[in-house]
Amino acid sequence: MKVSDIIRIGDKIDIRVLQEVEQAEKTDVTVKTYKSKVLDFRSNGNMEIAMPMEAGKLVLLQLGVRYELVFFSRESLYRAVGQVKERYKKDNICLRWN
């Protein structure tokens, strides 16, 4: 089974810095959550995800940092850990590979 069989283009995503999530479990501190969505799947298994926006401004997620991704599919929620591999602009939308 492929990821694209479970998660679809357009599915919403909550993104949080994994290290902050792990710290919050110990300290009960609230972790910043960024909203995004799935844009495309690549043949190499990577995923294109829109860079999140906050207060009308683009949030540039750091390269190489591990993020917790919670996918809201039609059937269920799915959690994964991923990294930004590349940031680029395509059709006036900033994307990342995960």
Task: Explain the meaning of each model-derived region.
Residues 1-98:
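Structured alpha-helical
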